[in-house]
Amino acid sequence: MQENISVTDSYSTGNAAQAMLEKLLQIYDVKTLVAQLNGVGENHWSAAILKRALANDSAWHRLSEKEFAHLQTLLPKPPAHHPHYAFRFIDLFAGIGGIRRGFESIGGQCVFTSEWNKHAVRTYKANHYCDPATHHFNEDIRDITLSHKEGVSDEAAAEHIRQHIPEHDVLLAGFPCQPFSLAGVSKKNSLGRAHGFACDTQGTLFFDVVRIIDARRPAMFVLENVKNLKSHDQGKTFRIIMQTLDELGYDVADAEDNGPDDPKIIDGKHFLPQHRERIVLVGFRRDLNLKADFTLRDISECFPAQRVTLAQLLDPMVEAKYILTPVLWKYLYRYAKKHQARGNGFGYGMVYPNNPQSVTRTLSARYYKDGAEILIDRGWDMATGEKDFDDPLNQQHRPRRLTPRECARLMGFEAPGEAKFRIPVSDTQAYRQFGNSVVVPVFAAVAKLLEPKIKQAVALRQQEAQHGRRSR
């Protein structure tokens, strides 16, 4: 009896260790895992040893209990409410999960994620728990919607979507901004096909979002995009999007409010010291009568009473590599002076941590190139720089760029002074990821506003399911 238990325990341990290592290798490279294992100090590990052990399914033989426990800490933990979730949602064009965090914070369960960028996937999996029993991870959303395959009918595509994407109450998507072309419309009309979203949006990633909404009919959706979506292609892109969502049978909050203070456009500066405007489209399924008086104007109720300052987000000491080189600083300085003389505002964006009202420009995906849009002042004397740019003493105070960790805080992925958000990628990839992401507390606020509506939608779904069981 003792022998049987021992064999079973060893088999279970082996399976668990192998599965854990496979998950970790989706996030971290072998070099990082070797460093983590050697940090425990119980065995000597090398890249060759780990690779050989993985290839032979024998890594668990070498892993000590302490090493196993340490590696487990490198994986994200389930949310506090696991496994008692209030509703289900999916996360499309997920990036590193900025929108997801807000909806998870109100009790939601993510049941499907789609993200094509392999580096973003690593960061996503490092920070977000994905229940293997209920969560599906996809890379190219077109493999689900079949939009890249010719000759697939809408009915066949819808069935394929239903097979691969679980039922959900809320759809989240930060879809890319692309122009819509009407090329091919006359051909489709000549074939007797109705002119609608399948025509106008074909070939764009928004079309994939539309196909999923149409196939799965979630109670609501939250779509995010850059502010310029409204003016993109002389307004045609936004007009087609709104018409399409209406055709699908959804009411978008504040749809008619398109003035200069459009509530659909939310600036991250209300939550964190970064000017970052994004358009947020919140849609409600018309037949469920959920929208009522919902408006994003109420988001002001969620603004923090005291916004954190830029200084609170910064580390007191950073590595020298984040300080601009003399050559780069001279180039940016002269570039700005040249454009100032021409009367335009092109140039770097210096921010001063000593000023509690400082707000940065928008962090972009190109920040890794030179960091010009957000430079942190380190005491550079402008008057001295005008007289003698190369003054040795002043050169010691050249500005610096943000570190990836500081970018995580500026985007709201972690609080001031924290280092909880895992960044398993290079600085270049991290800058791209944060620059492509959203201000997390903005969408936490949107989720909070939607919480009563989501509860209402879940109650309707449960009533419908109960009624269906009774009628059988």
From Swiss-Prot:
Domain SAM-dependent MTase C5-type: 87-457
Active site: C177
Gene3D superfamilies xrefs: 1.10.260.140, 3.90.120.30, Vaccinia Virus protein VP39
The keyword S-adenosyl-L-methionine belongs to this UniProt entry's keyword annotation: yes
GO BP, sorted A to Z: DNA restriction-modification system; methylation; negative regulation of gene expression via chromosomal CpG island methylation
Stretches assigned to coiled coil: none
CDD domains the record matches: Cyt_C5_DNA_methylase
GO molecular function: DNA (cytosine-5-)-methyltransferase activity; DNA binding
One Pfam match: DNA_methylase
SUPFAM superfamilies: S-adenosyl-L-methionine-dependent methyltransferases
EC numbers, comma separated: 2.1.1.37
Keyword annotations of the record: DNA-binding, Methyltransferase, Restriction system, S-adenosyl-L-methionine, Transferase
Top-level EC class: transferase
Family membership: Belongs to the class I-like SAM-binding methyltransferase superfamily. C5-methyltransferase family.
PANTHER family given in the database record: CYTOSINE-SPECIFIC METHYLTRANSFERASE (PTHR10629), DNA (CYTOSINE-5)-METHYLTRANSFERASE 1 (PTHR10629:SF52)
Protein name: DNA-cytosine methyltransferase
